[in-house]
């Protein structure tokens, strides 16, 4: 144990001495409120190991994050899984549950939902994300009646709150609207889907030491990830 501790201390000293510059991290919308996401813990861990590295955190869409990783603007990304790019390396981190919601002024609010089916949902205007994502894949697969699009989940929430549209949101994000009586989950045991979130790195050139260290921190704080 003494040898292991000494080796760990030596590693930390080397990291502190040699690692500097800036690390650009990009994450998908509304991850901070997800109890399964421990990105803040990864940031804390990284900051302890590499205090001289300046951190810059961005929130962006899946496609913008992947493009940014490929062109070198971002070093590490965290996104929901969708379709993989051959230029990128992905590693599983955590999950998220998406439920279907309506706003307080919607016809389905406060009504029984037992008779609702995916087919019946097509009678109601749907608001979905504008970019390729698990949200878009599901709405196409279920043939929902898309009448509005949002660039991110904040936009979807506004559309749902209008009372004119149904839409999917992360359960952890929508819970505060539910508690305030502004939204209702519609038959959550039936109308839901789950998605996995992954870290994203560029395959070539090889990640910088700071990038690899942050990736290691992400993996360390998500022990339940699918390996």
Segments the model singles out, each with a brief description of its role:
Residues 22-29, 77, 127, 167, ...:
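Short, well-ordered beta-strand segments
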Residues 190-204:
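Periplasmic-binding protein-like
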Residues 90-164, 169-192, 212, 219-227:
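C-terminal regulatory
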């Amino acid at each position: 144990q003494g040898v292991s501790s000494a080796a760990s201390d030596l590693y930390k000293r080397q990291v502190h001495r040699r690692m500097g510059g800036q690390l650009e991290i990009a994450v998908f919308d509304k991850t901070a409120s997800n109890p399964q996401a421990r990105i803040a813990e990864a940031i804390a861990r990284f900051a302890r190991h590499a205090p001289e590295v300046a951190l810059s955190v961005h929130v962006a869409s899946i496609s913008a994050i992947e493009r940014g990783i490929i062109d070198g603007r971002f070093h590490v990304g965290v996104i929901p899984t969708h379709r993989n790019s051959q230029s990128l390396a992905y590693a599983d981190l955590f999950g998220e549950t998406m439920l279907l919601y309506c706003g307080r002024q919607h016809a389905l609010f406060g009504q029984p939902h037992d008779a609702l089916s995916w087919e019946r949902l097509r009678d109601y205007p749907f608001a979905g994300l504008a970019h390729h994502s698990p949200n878009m894949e599901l709405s196409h697969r279920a043939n929902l009646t898309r009448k509005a699009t949002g660039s991110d989940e904040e936009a979807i929430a506004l559309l749902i709150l209008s009372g004119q549209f149904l839409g999917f949101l992360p359960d952890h994000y929508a819970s505060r609207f539910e508690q305030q009586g502004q939204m209702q989950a519609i038959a959550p045991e039936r109308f839901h889907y789950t998605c996995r979130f992954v870290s994203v790195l560029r395959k070539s050139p090889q990640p910088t030491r700071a990038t690899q260290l942050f990736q290691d921190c992400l993996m360390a704080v998500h022990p339940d990830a699918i390996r």
